[in-house]
Amino acid sequence: MDKKLILAIESSCDETSAAVVVNGREVLSNVISTQIDTHKKFGGVVPEVASRMHIEIIDYVVKKALEDANVSLDDIDAIGVTYGPGLIGALLVGLQYAKGLAFASKKPLIGVNHIQGHISANFIQYKDLKPPFISLVVSGGHTFIVSVNDFCDFEVIGKTRDDAVGEAYDKVARSLGLGYPGGPKIDKLAKEGDPDAISFPRAKFHEDTLDFSFSGVKSAVLNYLNKANMKGIEVNNADVAASFQKAVIDVLKDNVFLTCKKKNVNKIAIAGGVASNSCLRETLKKEGALRNIEILFPEPVLCTDNAAMIGSAAYFNYEKNYVSSFDINAKPNLKLGER
């Protein structure tokens, strides 16, 4: 097989990343510059600040990715870049940089959907992984159950109707005084608590759907804390964290395994920042073993936003001749499968 080298760029939120990926599976470099410490004091990502920080660092990050991979731009076959979904200003920084690079070097430009990128992280982690399989995409801004029919063929089976999982985690963490980002902090605190101490609601839709809703459980936690505060009752934060986390993961677990049953598929690949959550990993692995369903997780560095996953997705798009024109624009609400 001929080696195809993809230079990939990711800037959809608060990570500026560039990577060099071979044939969608082998990572030669994956440079990530995170803005977490900057946004922490604001309690969340400030879009304008994120955009400015991307502008300041992107040139260095791309050059460092080429240097770490020990290749030059001449060695690159195509340039992949995230063009949605995400923050419009942040997306534009990466996209415009990639356009300029592709134009100047006469390399093909490959626009990549950020969600496809998250799913493709599993192709890096598992070198022999091939569709079909089910993917559960869980992150700060996205929650999807996706039927991966082929490398570039996706069917959204379920999605959140309100808050994404990571969004709910951040809001609950803030109410518990844990700060931002909330996911890792709740995961850590929950280990000290009783997941059955408090009964928080699990949203179930009556119609034939595998969609999610996490605004109810988030509101239930906030109401519980407010009532306890008004009555002067001391709250066990670890129990709240553990009970909230169990409520969320129960719903994710039920819907994704029901999808496997409906689609007659015995493989689930988890993706997105929340895929690093230890309780989610343990719960799905345990349930998967009982149901004889294989559960796949990328390593944590591939769960967070990174350019290696974009490079993998770009390679498979390139193989299908999904090459972008230079009038491609950033799409903050880009749907999976939209071209």
Curated annotation (Swiss-Prot):
This enzyme's EC code(s): 2.3.1.234
Residues the record lists as binding substrate: 137-141, 170, 183, 187, 277
Cofactor: Fe(2+)
Cofactor binding description: Binds 1 Fe(2+) ion per subunit.
Gene3D superfamilies found in the cross-reference section: 3.30.420.40
An example Gene Ontology biological process: tRNA threonylcarbamoyladenosine modification
Annotated residues for binding of Fe cation: 114, 118, 305
Major subcellular site: cytoplasm
GO CC annotations on file: cytoplasm
Enzyme class per UniProt: transferase
Gene Ontology terms, MF aspect: iron ion binding; N(6)-L-threonylcarbamoyladenine synthase activity
Entry keywords, A to Z: Acyltransferase, Cytoplasm, Iron, Metal-binding, Transferase, tRNA processing
Location(s), subcellular: Cytoplasm
Reactions catalysed, as given in the entry: L-threonylcarbamoyladenylate + adenosine(37) in tRNA = N(6)-L-threonylcarbamoyladenosine(37) in tRNA + AMP + H(+)
Listed PANTHER family: TRNA N6-ADENOSINE THREONYLCARBAMOYLTRANSFERASE, TRNA N6-ADENOSINE THREONYLCARBAMOYLTRANSFERASE, MITOCHONDRIAL
Family classification: Belongs to the KAE1 / TsaD family.
Function summary: Required for the formation of a threonylcarbamoyl group on adenosine at position 37 (t(6)A37) in tRNAs that read codons beginning with adenine. Is involved in the transfer of the threonylcarbamoyl moiety of threonylcarbamoyl-AMP (TC-AMP) to the N6 group of A37, together with TsaE and TsaB. TsaD likely plays a direct catalytic role in this reaction.
Designated name of the protein: tRNA N6-adenosine threonylcarbamoyltransferase
Organism listed in the record: Clostridium botulinum (strain Eklund 17B / Type B)
